[in-house]
Amino acid sequence: MRVIGLMSGTSYDAIEAAAADLTLDGDSLLLRPLGHLSVPYPDDLRALIAATLPPAATTTQAVCALDSGIGQAFATAAARALRELCAGAADLVVSHGQTMHHWVEDGVVRGTLQLGQPAWIAEETGLPVVSDLRSRDVAAGGQGAPLVGLTDTLLLRALPGTPAALNLGGIANVTVVAPGAEPLAFDTGPANALLDAAVRHFTGDGAAYDADGRRAAAGTVSPELLRFLLADPYYRRPAPKTTGKELFHLPYLLRALDAVPTPATDDVLATLTRLTAVTVADACRAHGVTELVASGGGTRNPVLMRMIDEELPGVPVRRSDDLGLPSDAKEALAFAVLGFLTVHGLPGTHPSATGAVRATLLGSITPGLAPLRLPAPVARPPHLLRIV
């Protein structure tokens, strides 16, 4: 089955589209990547997303406009992927949409909202669309995140020791696969979320991120600011757990800066970069990780990757590209896998990874132009993911 996966993370800068041929072969899921592309959000849509995200107030009119606008942007990305990556022929589109709110109270996820109306994608491509992949896990008592955990688990099972997959997006998350134990997946804390917010704030929106970590490299870590940030109760909560920009946003950072002697801008960026490295390393040490496989936009920040290396001496860190899974496309491919599992009647989560009471089939299906015909249900889920 040829599947297109679409993803936009908490950095909300672009839609990542990836295509793959997926085939079940015994206890293995075979994945042949067909390529990936990145489609930036239009400036006005990105500005509306930024103006609507927590802690901002909004209106139902803005939510409706976003649902249509994001759906249309995802439809454009899907059409490009269909044309440029699939030579015009595919079977399924899987759309994560854009997370606008992840509702957490006292550590319990009450709901999650991803916008991007899938009807626009189905109409543009003519293909069936699997979307809204997080809500079913939440309804089953889970965190609804991180959903890359199942794909990570299938990939890591072939590695020795206790490997972990690390995704460095707006939020950092890890999946740990220890021998003889159920897989564990959780958000460790902010990756690019606070960094990007700080850069935009201090440059008056003149820059969106710290390119190559150059400004962090020019700064010095503030012990007072780092200590204050590490005191956040989130880091002491047990896994599985999830977080997002509902917690780690610009006002959160500004409150922290008000509480300590104010560092220079580059020192703030150095401290935030070190915060990500420390919280990732703490999570890995707590679970005996022996190897780290990293992906996501944060892997392009050499200063962040160096700091993670420094915090985890003796633990090799490599990119998912080394395993055949392109780092920039990994999340989009992971959602392609989840949609493939859904249409084959297979669950897309491990309860140990999300905290749900059961493994659930994920998402809702929007038919394409042709009558909806699903594959025959498969009795046994795959045990391994092989990149071919």
Could you say what each language-model-derived stretch is?
Residues A56-G116:
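Short beta-strand-loop/turn "lid" adjacent to the catalytic site in phosphate-handling enzymes
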